[in-house]
C-alpha cells in the first residue's frame, strides 16, 4: 500500500513539474530580456575613473579650508593643523597654513616653494617627497592617468558620493604607504594616507567652492 501511494504521489509531482516547467519556459524569455535591460542600464549608469577625472578637473579654480590630522603611534592625540587652499587647474596649489603657525606653501610642476620675506623659495626635496607632491596634485585635480602610473585604482560609488582606493604599485611608494583612500562628491572632500610604519594622515577639505578664475593676488603668487 505504501509503495502504491508513493508511486501515485510521484506521478502527481511529475505532472505538476511538467506543467510548472511550461510556465517557467514561457516566462524565461521575458526574464532574460528584463535582466538584459537591467545590465544595460547598470553599465550606462556606472561611475568610472574617466568620469571622475572629468568631474574633478572641470572647475578652473577651487577654494576652501582644510583640516589636517597627523596620527602618530607615539602620541595619544593627533597633530592638527588648519588653513586655506587655492587649487588652480593650470597653475598648481596654494597651501596657506594658519594654525598652529602661519606659513604659505606653493606646489606646482617645479616642486614645492615656501614663502619668506624674500619671496617664494624652492624647498630642496628628496625624490620620495617630490613624488608625494606630484601625487597630492594628481589627487586633487582628479588626474587618474597620472595616478595609474604608481597605483592600483579601485573606484566605488556614484558621482555624488564616491570612494577611490589607491594601492601602491611602485617600489618607492610601497616603502611609504600601505594605502590611500580618497572620497568626495563634486569635489574631493577627504584624503587618508596610511603609512607603512603605522602612522596616518587624514585631510579634510571643507567649504570647497569652484570658481572661474584666480584673483590678481593668487595669480601673482603662482607667477613668482
Ranges and model annotations:
Residues 3-33:
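Bacterial N-terminal signal peptides that target proteins for export
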Residues 32-42:
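Bacterial N-terminal signal peptides
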Residues 43-65, 71-76, 220-224:
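N-terminal leader/targeting segments and the immediate start of mature chains
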Residues 59-61, 80-82, 90, 100, ...:
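Extracytoplasmic
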Residues 66, 93-97, 112-115, 164-166, ...:
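Short hydrophobic/aromatic-rich beta-strand segments that constitute the beta-sheet cores
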Residues 75-79, 84-89, 93-99, 104-107, ...:
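Structural recognition of beta-strand segments within beta-rich domains
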Residues 115-138:
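Acidic/charged, solvent-exposed loop-and-adjacent secondary-structure segments enriched in E/D, K/R, S/T
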Residues 144, 148-152, 156-224:
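Gly/Pro-enriched, hydrophobic low-complexity segments
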